[in-house]
């Protein structure tokens, strides 16, 4: 059978007569096929619950819906045929109907003459013997022949039959749910007598059936696609469901039927399935129906239950059964893999056909699509949701101090009387912590309107307490106060330090007592001598005078030390004394410990490995850095890089020389410093041992702020530093802030890379609160959080801010600390790409930025910021548009107008030097476009293309100016005329001989160039200027051999030009004051020599050199003869 007819894709014509003859041959085996077909029907009806529940009339009329264009004509013929057949029916009585009826619904056409053929055939049977419709001479036969002759041209299409098995494959046909159409056609034959009663009823029924069929097709497409997606899983589910033997028998009978059909040829297959799906006469259908009901009573009952069940429950059951079966299959596969892993290779006989579970199809299930749809709708509602409706209506309670400390909160949705940020600051004010996602550590979920479904589901699964807005306020109101754990830790640390201080004086006193007896004996001897010499009164006075002096000295020393400590800054006062005290560097794999191990093993590693590393850089590097001669510490300021380097050197006993940005680090100064540091000895060695210490190798060089080596002061410093690293005999420690700086990229390959990260807020907070407790400064822990975040986690900046605020008052509240930290917020330098991203960014990042903050983005680099905005505003999807293209275009238009206004202001600033208009330009060029197009960028910010185009415009203008000057003696025209009228023709004249003649055309081109006084550079410039952008020039398409021949021919000859060929060189006479005198003298000598060479006559191209003849001239001979005579006369 044709698969296109099976699905009703095209309108089929009348069945040809040959097919009816073929069907007569297959009628003998029709009984057996019917039995199997009944089993198939039962199986299909169980799977296709949706189609079975529909009325039976619609399926019958499907043949009429896909009718040809001549429907009106056929209906008239049907009416006449019916009237004649009714007259004949009076004389004939139908006898027993035989099953071998060749006209019983054999035709596959969609026309109404099927009914005529059926009725006429039934009337022509007498005494149980069927008369041949082609041999009889009755009126019915005449009517049949008239109808056939009229309808033959309506079905001229001959279609090659295609089997369902060939189209879908054997497995798909076994499990196809679309065979429900055949059973419905059989059932619909019972209702044919009702449609014959009245012609008007037939027309009305046709119209109704057309509408019903269209609706059914609309709903059937989606179901058909889903059944195709679930074809491979359905049979397994039905096997699991059916425990009765009848289900197994039906499935096996279907398989037997299919195996028989496969043995035959493809046309036989088509006939077999076409006869199986055709309907037959009412009497025969009644018998077949009764036999089916008798054979399969349980399946008919099961079919009724399936028809009564709703669609949704059936689909859910199918999906659940499918998931269970796929899960069981995966478990079985995993178990088989484990067994096969334990078995030897010879026993691995598991077939690969078992791995048929379609994982990709499960991801495209209806549940997943529904989830995606709901997530999309939730996100859209999140973007469009309203703010608090009763803002400020509820009184915010005042809770106890640190009442929420140790509790973690998550806020979701919109709170009605308070903003989200205010709720977050309220929780943090009382010591609580607010996170973004629900986890096991979350104590409370504060839920508002339009809350997130995933957070609420996760909180319910983890057993997290859910609060509303009132519940949060009641919790703050009722929770008791707590003492901060940071204060308790600071007190414990203070007690430990006091106990240490109390123990240390006792040790000193014991040491003094041990040493004092020898001194006392010497002093007693002196006292005796003085007593003998002097009177006792004098000795008493001396003793009395010496004792108070010693006391005064101790007191003054203590007072001086206390005064010095008070004068010190907190940064120096609480500077770490050991590596353990550095914040954020306590771990074993921290950068401080890595540097310590690297420096300890620096002299142990062989110099060959270090040379190899210096040559090949990253390729020879190791995790411990043993192959590097230098280390590079990079990270943000205030994280302890310099402190780490100095403490590591002190701990290992290295003496170090530090060069920072305040020192001159040029090429010569680096040589001198390194040479001195290699030969120097520390003065500390003279005190430890009496003799002068020998020169040791335990020296180190610390180069701080390497990325700041620029300008005339440090010219050549980076290259000299790299050279020192290659040949150094001492370790070098370099430090920088920006590791991605262009100057550092070459240095990175020769250094052990150690990247410092900012410490966490908790690490900094505990150390700062202990320092504040020692200084008597009362700061609540939430206020300390704000101070640390305001300083961008810079430990040095936090200490400076604390010392400054402590000078005013010894207590800080949360609000005061938050306000002060915002005012003292550290300014961070942003690049142009970061500025552009922030100008158009939407969300929390820019939600609280004021107008001044937005205009400050413009002032990061006011010369290039407008260009970045103009280049990237087209790549932003604005939130205000909401996906509407018309609104998007309106916003683009307004942003473009604002950028144009900003350009007009910039023109006024540059032309009239009116720099007071810069804030106005900031509003037009940055703030307004950012507000209009605030949204999400679809790509990384791109560099302004205007800069490249402006540069190429200037270059081309300069080239055209030079060309017009060189050709002025021939063209006598302006620059514009040369550009528009001459260059294109000159280009063609220069390239055409080379393309047509090849190497031989080079001389012709050179002659033309000499005519117009053009140089080789002018030739290349003409090719560049006269070709359109992006397209290759005509000269570039030439053969390389021709180009080389042209270049050689041009260089052989001397070319005279009416203009001077001056080579512009940068004069180095005006050197900066930072250069040494030796270098400046060398530069001056080089410049004078170059000037003399330029002024020499021999080097001038316009003067022709004289060729010296081989014979000497007369004057030269006379001079030589005079010289010879003088020599002889002297002798």
Curated annotation (Swiss-Prot):
Domain BRCT, chain residue ranges per copy: 399-489
Biased composition (Basic and acidic residues): 38-54, 184-201, 334-350, 359-373, 1113-1123
GO biological process, one term: DNA-templated DNA replication
Residues bound to ATP: 635-642
A GO molecular-function annotation: ATP hydrolysis activity
Function: Subunit of the replication factor C (RFC) complex which acts during elongation of primed DNA templates by DNA polymerases delta and epsilon, and is necessary for ATP-dependent loading of proliferating cell nuclear antigen (PCNA) onto primed DNA. This subunit binds to the primer-template junction. Binds the PO-B transcription element as well as other GA rich DNA sequences. Can bind single- or double-stranded DNA.
Name the UniProt record assigns to this protein: Replication factor C subunit 1
Gene: Rfc1
């Amino acid at each position: 059978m044709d698969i296109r007819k099976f699905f009703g894709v095209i309108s089929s014509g009348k069945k040809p007569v040959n097919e009816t003859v073929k069907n007569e041959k297959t009628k003998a085996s029709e009984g057996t096929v019917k039995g199997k077909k009944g089993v198939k029907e039962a199986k299909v009806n169980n799977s296709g619950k949706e189609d079975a529940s529909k009325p039976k009339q619609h399926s019958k009329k499907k043949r009429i819906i896909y009718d040809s264009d001549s429907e009106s004509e056929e209906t008239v013929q049907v009416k006449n045929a019916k009237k004649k057949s009714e007259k004949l029916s009076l004389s004939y009585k139908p006898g027993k109907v035989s099953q071998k009826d060749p006209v019983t619904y054999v035709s596959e056409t969609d026309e109404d003459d099927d009914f005529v053929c059926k009725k006429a055939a039934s009337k022509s049977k007498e005494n149980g013997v069927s008369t041949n419709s082609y041999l009889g001479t009755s009126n019915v036969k005449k009517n049949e022949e008239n109808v056939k002759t009229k309808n033959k041209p309506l079905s001229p299409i001959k279609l090659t039959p295609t089997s369902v098995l060939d189209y879908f494959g054997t497995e798909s046909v076994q499990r196809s749910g679309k065979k429900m159409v055949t059973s419905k056609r059989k059932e619909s034959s019972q209702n044919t007598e009702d449609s014959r009663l009245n012609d008007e009823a037939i027309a009305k029924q046709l119209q109704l059936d057309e509408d019903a069929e269209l609706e059914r097709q609309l709903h059937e497409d989606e179901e058909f696609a889903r059944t195709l997606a679930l074809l491979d899983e359905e049979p397994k589910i039905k096997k699991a469901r059916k425990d009765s033997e009848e289900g197994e028998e039906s499935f096996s009978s279907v398989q037997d039927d299919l195996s028989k059909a496969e043995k035959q040829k493809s046309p036989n297959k088509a006939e077999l399935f076409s006869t199986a799906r055709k309907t037959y006469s009412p009497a025969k259908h009644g018998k077949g129906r009764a036999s089916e009901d008798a054979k399969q009573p349980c399946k008919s009952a099961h079919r009724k239950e399936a028809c009564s069940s709703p669609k949704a429950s059936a689909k859910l059951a199918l999906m659940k059964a499918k998931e269970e079966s796929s899960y069981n299959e995966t478990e079985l596969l995993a178990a088989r893999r484990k067994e096969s892993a334990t078995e030897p290779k010879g026993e691995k006989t598991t077939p690969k056909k078992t791995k048929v579970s379609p994982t990709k199809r499960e991801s495209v299930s209806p549940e997943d699509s529904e989830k995606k749809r709901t997530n999309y709708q939730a996100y859209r509602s999140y973007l469009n949701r309203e703010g608090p409706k009763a803002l400020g209506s509820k009184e915010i309670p005042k809770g106890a101090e640190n009442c929420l400390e140790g509790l973690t909160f998550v806020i979701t949705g919109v709170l009605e009387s308070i903003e989200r940020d205010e709720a977050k600051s309220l929780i943090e004010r009382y010591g609580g912590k607010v996170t973004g996602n629900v986890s096991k550590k979350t104590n409370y979920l504060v839920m508002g309107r339009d809350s997130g479904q995933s957070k609420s589901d996760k909180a319910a699964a983890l057993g997290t307490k859910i609060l509303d807005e009132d519940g949060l306020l009641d919790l703050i109101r009722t929770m008791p106060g707590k003492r901060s754990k940071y204060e308790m830790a600071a007190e414990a640390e203070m007690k430990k330090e006091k106990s240490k201080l109390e123990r240390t004086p006792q040790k000193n006193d014991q040491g003094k007592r041990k040493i004092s007896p020898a001194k006392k004996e010497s002093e007693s001897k002196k006292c005796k001598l003085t007593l003998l010499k002097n009177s006792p009164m004098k000795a008493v006075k001396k003793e009395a005078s010496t004792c108070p002096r010693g006391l005064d000295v101790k007191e003054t020393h203590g007072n001086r030390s206390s005064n010095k400590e008070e004068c010190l800054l907190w940064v120096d006062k609480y500077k770490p004394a050991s590596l353990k005290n550095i914040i954020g560097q306590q771990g074993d794999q921290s950068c401080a410990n890595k540097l310590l191990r690297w420096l300890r093993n620096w002299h142990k590693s062989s110099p060959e490995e270090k040379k190899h590393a210096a040559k090949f850089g990253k390729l020879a590097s190791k995790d411990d850095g043993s192959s590097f001669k230098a280390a590079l510490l990079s990270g943000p300021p205030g994280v302890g890089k310099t402190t780490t380097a100095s403490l590591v050197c002190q701990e290992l006993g290295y003496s170090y020389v530090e060069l920072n940005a305040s020192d001159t680090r040029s090429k010569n100064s680096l040589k001198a410093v390194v040479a001195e540091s290699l030969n120097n000895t520390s003065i500390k060695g003279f005190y430890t041992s009496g003799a002068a210490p020998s020169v040791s190798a335990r020296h180190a060089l610390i180069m701080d702020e390497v990325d700041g080596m620029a300008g005339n002061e440090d010219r050549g410093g980076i290259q000299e530093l790299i050279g020192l690293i290659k040949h150094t005999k001492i370790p070098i420690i370099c430090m920088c802030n920006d590791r991605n700086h262009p100057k550092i990229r070459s240095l990175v390959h020769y250094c052990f890379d150690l990247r410092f990260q900012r410490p966490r807020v908790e690490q900094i907070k505990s150390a700062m609160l202990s320092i504040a407790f020692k200084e008597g400064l009362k700061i609540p822990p939430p206020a300390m959080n704000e101070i640390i975040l305001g300083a961008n986690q810079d430990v040095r900046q936090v200490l400076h801010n604390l010392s400054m605020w402590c000078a005013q008052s010894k207590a800080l509240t949360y609000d005061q600390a938050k306000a002060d930290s915002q005012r003292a917020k550290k300014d961070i330098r942003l690049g142009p790409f970061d500025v552009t991203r922030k100008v158009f960014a939407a969300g929390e990042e820019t939600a609280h930025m004021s107008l001044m903050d937005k205009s400050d983005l413009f002032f990061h680099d006011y010369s290039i910021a407008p260009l970045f905005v103009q280049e990237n505003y087209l790549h932003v999807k604005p939130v205000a548009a909401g996906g509407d293209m018309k609104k998007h275009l309106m916003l683009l238009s307004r942003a473009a107008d604002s950028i144009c206004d900003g350009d007009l202001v910039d023109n006024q600033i540059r032309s009239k030097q009116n720099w007071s208009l810069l804030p106005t330009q900031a509003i037009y060029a940055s703030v307004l476009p950012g507000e209009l197009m605030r949204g999400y960028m679809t790509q990384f910010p791109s560099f302004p293309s205007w800069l490249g185009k402006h540069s190429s415009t200037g270059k081309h203008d300069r080239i055209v100016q030079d060309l017009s000057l060189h050709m002025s003696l021939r063209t006598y025209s302006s620059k514009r005329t040369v550009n528009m009228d001459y260059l294109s023709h000159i280009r063609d004249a220069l390239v055409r001989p080379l393309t047509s003649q090849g190497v031989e055309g080079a001389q012709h081109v050179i002659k033309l160039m000499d005519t117009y006084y053009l140089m080789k550079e002018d030739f290349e410039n003409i090719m560049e200027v006269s070709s359109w952008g992006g397209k290759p020039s005509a000269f570039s398409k030439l053969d390389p051999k021709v180009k080389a021949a042209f270049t050689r021919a041009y260089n052989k000859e001397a070319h005279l030009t009416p203009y001077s060929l001056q080579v512009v060189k940068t004069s180095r006479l005006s050197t900066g004051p930072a250069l040494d005198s030796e270098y400046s003298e060398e530069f001056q000598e080089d410049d004078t020599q170059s000037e003399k060479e330029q002024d020499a006559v021999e080097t001038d191209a316009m003067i022709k050199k004289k060729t010296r003849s081989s014979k000497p001239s007369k004057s030269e001979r006379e001079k030589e003869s005079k010289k010879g005579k003088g020599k002889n006369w002297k002798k």
